[in-house]
Amino acid sequence: MAGNGVSTSADATWIGIGGVTSSDLIQTGTDDTVTASGQVSTIAFYELLPASETPIPSMTVSPGDAMSADIANLGGTAWRISLADVTRGETFSINVTYNSTLSTAEWIEEDPSFARGGLVPFDNFGLANFTGATATENGAVTTLTGAGAQAIIMENSHGQAIATPSVISSNGEGFSVTGGG
């Protein structure tokens, strides 16, 4: 990751349930913040919209750490959010209550928003890899390919790609996102 030389920038990498076709979203992942000079800090978080994200201070995440995430519906409005820093061997899990439409499953690399609205300047995160991406519904495991996953290219206000997903891997469970633009 490189600083832009002007201002603080950021990116977020997460998985979630809901949010594409509904206003509900339960998610967990990491946020990277990059100073103008290129100093990077990373935090782990979870979020239940419409509330703001909740940092996970018990996890010490470094930029580039391999992460594993799982969001499991335990029945009705009961959920378990699990996040692990595979590189460091740290884990976090919390049970929450949340009303979800279960409308979509998501694997996202994005430009986060300020709490007061508007987008944080987007950093050039390089490459984000997603592997083992599956969703389970009614006991049936579905891959990205099996679910008909749709790639979304993030563009800036000039129509230039700033985050571009790859094709889905041959096993149907992975892809990468390349930053820059």
Describe each PLM feature range.
Residues 1-181:
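Exposed, interaction-prone regions of secreted/extracellular proteins
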